[in-house]
Design a protein with these regions (language model features):
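Intracellular juxtamembrane helix-capping segments at the cytosolic ends
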Residues: 12-26, 221-242
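Juxtamembrane intracellular "pre-TM" segments in multi-pass secondary transporters
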Residues: 86-118
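Helix-to-loop junctions at the C-terminal end of transmembrane segments
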Residues: 164-183
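C-terminal transmembrane helical hairpin of 12-TM major facilitator-type secondary transporters
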Residues: 179-230
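A late C-terminal transmembrane helix in Major Facilitator Superfamily
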Residues: 238-252
Length: 252
């Protein structure tokens, strides 16, 4: 249990540092693409450390061997970290808890309409998150698909669609303003859930389910790319780690 806590602590700390680094190092015009790539990496990491790791541990390697393999996969990440460029702006390191936590919060809440910004952050992905939490139950109990069918479609096609959506969203954000991307992708996120309504009023068919899951995850990936770019834009580079951690925690 103690080892699990240490691993989780280190993982969360590394996540915060990475979010702060990408916020500091990426110029405004590259944040959409950067957000898309970070979503891609996150989803691939979920796939490798989740379903693939469970399958390999059960069939071939056992848990000890699996953890050694997962540790080895971190070596390229360490090399990439050593080669990564430093941010161009030199920012003083916080020397007290007040500078590290209190000042970033004062800076954020001192902005105009700070509470409206927080409301947007909380609500932007909320409906999509609710819908996704109900999807599996709806497809099994509401429509009548079996758990195996739903699992295969959600874990393979759904993951693939999320990755494609994030990358496509990043490409589109090179041509759209952040506001337009958030608006269009947000509307698509909401509209994509209509596919499940169609499933409820039509005959059960595997292709129909796959299409609904694909479209919903595609639009969700596009929305996630725009949303991460928004969080990066809202952060003051002097306080990027604390502010990104705060905003991402609220969105979760």
């Amino acid at each position: 249990a103690a080892l699990a806590v240490v691993i989780a602590f280190c993982s969360a700390s590394q996540d915060i540092v990475f979010d702060a680094w990408k916020t500091d190092v990426l110029p405004a015009e590259e944040r959409g693409a950067g957000a898309a790539i970070s979503v891609l990496g996150y989803r691939l990491g979920m796939l490798v450390s989740g379903g693939l790791a469970l399958w390999l541990a059960d069939r071939y390697m056992g848990w000890q061997g699996m953890y050694w393999l997962m540790a080895a996969l971190l070596i390229p990440c360490i090399i990439a970290t050593l080669l990564a460029p430093e941010p161009s702006d030199v920012i003083p390191v916080p020397r007290s808890l007040e500078q590290a936590v209190a000042e970033p919060l004062r800076d954020f809440f001192g902005r105009n309409n700070a509470w409206l910004i927080l409301l947007l952050i909380v609500l932007y992905k909320l409906g999509d998150a609710f819908a996704m939490s109900l999807t599996t139950t709806f497809l099994i109990r509401g429509v009548g698909f079996d758990a195996g069918e739903v699992g295969v479609v959600n874990k393979t096609l759904g993951l693939f669609a999320t990755i494609v959506g994030a990358l496509y969203g990043g490409v589109l954000m090179q041509r759209l303003t952040l506001f337009r991307a958030l608006l269009i992708f947000g509307i698509l996120q909401g509209a994509s859930n209509a596919g499940y309504w169609l499933l409820s009023i039509t005959d059960k068919h595997m292709i129909s389910m796959a299409a609904a899951v694909f479209f919903e995850n595609l639009c969700g990936g596009m929305g996630t790319a725009a949303f991460v770019a928004l969080l990066m834009t809202l952060c003051n580079k002097s306080f990027s780690a604390t502010q990104f951690a705060l905003l991402s925690a609220l969105s979760a």
